[in-house]
Each structure stands twice: as C-alpha cells, then as structure tokens.
C-alpha cells in the first residue's frame, strides 16, 4: 500500500479550500453557524450552539491531510452544535468531557471518514477537485492509501493502528513531569528516545517533536489520553448504532444525516447534563475497549490480508 497516490503532485491550495467546504456540506455543517479558518495546528473553537469555528491546515502535497482534519474538527463542531438550547449559557453547555468529545471527532474522521463505503461515495467528487493528482487513481487505491499503517513523526497524521503509540509517548512524559522525575528542559531528549523506542522514528527537531502539539503550551496536561479513550468510545458507539441505523448504507450514499441524528439523540443534546460514564452508558452500554480492538483487528487484517 503506497501513500504516494495521495501526495505525489502539487495540490492547488484554492481547490483544497473548496474541497473543505464540500466536506463540511457532506457533514451537514450549517455554514451560518460554523466557520472554517486556516491555522498551523487544526482546532475547534465554540462559543455556543449557534457559533462554532473550526480550522484546518492545507498541505499542498497531501490532500488527505486537510481532508481528515476537516472531518475531525467537524465532528467536534457537530457535538457543540447539537447541544440543547435550554443548556446554553450555563455550565452544562459544553461537551461533557474531552474523551467523549474526541469520540465524536475521531468517529467522523476514522470510523466513517476512512471507511470503504464513505471513501467510495465521495471519491468521484475528490477526483473532480483534484483531477491532475488523482484522475488515474481508483477509489480502492485511495482507500488503501489513506488507511496505510506505518510509523509516523506527526501524531495528527498517524494511522489508526499506530495512533495510540503517539498518545503513549505523551502520557509517559506527562507522568514523569507531574511526578517530578523529569524536568522540562529534558523533554526533547526523552521524547526522541521514546519515539525511537515506540515507533522506530528519528525526531529531526523540536518543532516536529515535542512542540508539534499546542496542548502543553496551552496548559492542557493530561489531555492526550482522551484521544485513545475517544477512539474506544467511538467504536463502541458504532457497534450500537449499527443496530438502529443503516450506517454503511447511508455512508455509501455520502449521507451522514441518520448517523448524526443518532449521535445527537444519544450523545450531543445532553451537553454536560450527565457524567461522562453515564453518557457512554446511555449511548452504548458500559464502557469496554473490546469493540475498538475488534474494529482494528477486522480492518487491518482485511487491508493486509493477514
């Protein structure tokens, strides 16, 4: 499986911006309530359920980079936009926890966005935006390229299989920092050591190493495990959703409406009204990582013929 298909030639910047607009339309994001901006590190900023802004970064050599950051941040936006009106301007108006919040972003980015039915559904449009780069690439080739498993330097560009290794590096460093066994000045060296140990990756500089995320500089220590927790929550929600909704039939049409409606009913509307564990239980039963493990096993044994 090669990723050369995704990033072999220059992707015109304006087309990426137009494609991002298209993806937001597919997700059902009302542009009168959800803006899109550009930044170095994608993030979502919410004011209330009528005003949410998402951002992305355009890599002129890789259309998939912005594609999946828009789907990810769009998932955050849908959560905030789906919170009930009567909770607005109270302490219950935001998402209940970052673990649940990341379950929504990674649900749209990976469980739906990297699924074969969804990729096949939107791929004609992808080729329409990028005919020179992807005109001769089949939907199956593109699907395999955006799901290729390989160690990577940047967390936000990691595949689903190796993503949690990036989280583990940060978690180990945070534990040492908070426990007083590691000083901040030594973080770059420990980061490089762990990336080599966990992923076999050489870290070339601090910008692409311990400074690649905005979390620590913003004081968000202890945040990174929420990505792993959210991935597991999302897989469990998907398993339960499949009992109520024709998920893959909808995805194959590029219609995410019934998927978002289910999440809005089971998760979004409650904001912070319930405890995180109760939100998860209400949506899909007691938490277990088993659905996530099974999901990854099925997906990657199929992709690699194992």
What are these regions, as identified by a protein language model?
Residues 1-7, 11:
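Single conserved hydrophobic/aromatic residue that forms the stacking wall/gate
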Residues 13-32:
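Zn2+-dependent metallopeptidase catalytic core
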Residues 31-51:
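Long, charged, glycine-rich C-terminal linkers/tails
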Residues 31-33, 86-90, 114-124, 184-185:
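Acidic/polar loop patches that form or flank catalytic/metal-binding clefts of enzymes
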Residues 55-69:
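Short pre-active-site segment immediately N-terminal to the catalytic Zn-binding motif
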Residues 65-84, 102-106:
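Active-site recognition of the HExxH zinc-binding catalytic motif
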Residues 94-135:
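Post-HExxH zinc-binding segment in Zn-dependent metallohydrolases
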Residues 167, 171-306:
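C-terminal, non-catalytic "cap/extension" segments appended to globular domains
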């Amino acid at each position: 499986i090669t990723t050369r298909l995704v990033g072999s030639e220059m992707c015109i910047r304006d087309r990426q911006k137009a494609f991002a607009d298209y993806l937001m339309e597919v997700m059902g994001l009302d542009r009168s309530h959800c803006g899109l901006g550009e930044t170095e590190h994608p993030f979502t900023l919410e004011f209330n359920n009528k005003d949410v802004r998402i951002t992305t970064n355009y890599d002129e050599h890789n259309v998939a980079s912005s594609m999946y950051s828009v789907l990810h941040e769009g998932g955050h936006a849908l959560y905030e936009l789906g919170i009930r009106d009567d909770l607005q301007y109270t302490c219950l108006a935001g998402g209940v926890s970052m673990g649940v919040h990341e379950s929504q972003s990674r649900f749209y980015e990976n469980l739906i966005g990297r699924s074969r039915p969804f990729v096949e559904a939107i791929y004609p449009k992808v080729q329409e935006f990028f005919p020179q780069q992807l005109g001769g690439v089949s939907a199956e080739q593109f699907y395999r390229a955006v799901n290729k498993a390989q160690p990577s330097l940047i967390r936000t560009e990691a595949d689903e299989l190796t993503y949690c290794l990036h989280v583990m590096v940060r978690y180990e460093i945070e534990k040492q920092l908070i426990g007083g066994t590691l000083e901040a000045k030594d973080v770059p060296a420990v980061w490089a050591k762990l990336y080599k140990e966990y992923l076999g990756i050489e870290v070339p500089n601090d910008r692409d190493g311990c400074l690649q995320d905005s979390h620590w500089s913003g004081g968000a220590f202890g945040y990174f495990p929420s990505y792993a927790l959210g991935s597991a929550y999302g897989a469990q929600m998907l398993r339960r959703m499949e009992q109520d909704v024709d998920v893959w039939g909808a995805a194959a049409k590029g219609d995410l409406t019934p998927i978002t409606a289910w999440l809005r009913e089971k998760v979004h509307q409650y904001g912070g009204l319930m405890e995180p564990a109760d939100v998860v239980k209400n949506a899909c039963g007691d938490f277990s990582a088993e659905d996530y493990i099974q999901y990854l096993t099925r997906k990657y044994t199929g992709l690699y013929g194992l």
